[in-house]
Amino acid sequence: MLGAAGLGDIGQLFPDTGKEFHGADSLEMLRRVAKMVDDAGWTLANADCTVIIDQPQIAPVKDEMESNLSDAAGGTVTVCGKRTEGIGALGRGEGVVAIAVALLETK
């Protein structure tokens, strides 16, 4: 959402060097981003998020994730889980990849 609105990126707003962000509530961070986007004259039409991870599986919590994210973002957010079927570092549980695209509309 930040990038689509021309407001920089998440690392600028919430740097990983900022101790105040360690353990922060991610939904509250999303609400803050949504407010910035709104203040800049944009509204979220929709966002599509793909999470690549073998475990835990996304399916059992997909609806709850979508509801929580949509509420915090102020627009429709969909979540899709993808698995690597045990291939590579992700398959060994050494990481997770999240990719999202957001469509914004002018208010």
Predicted regions and their residues:
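C-terminal binding/interaction regions
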Residues: 46, 57-63, 67, 71-107
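RNase III-family endoribonuclease catalytic core
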Residues: 1-72
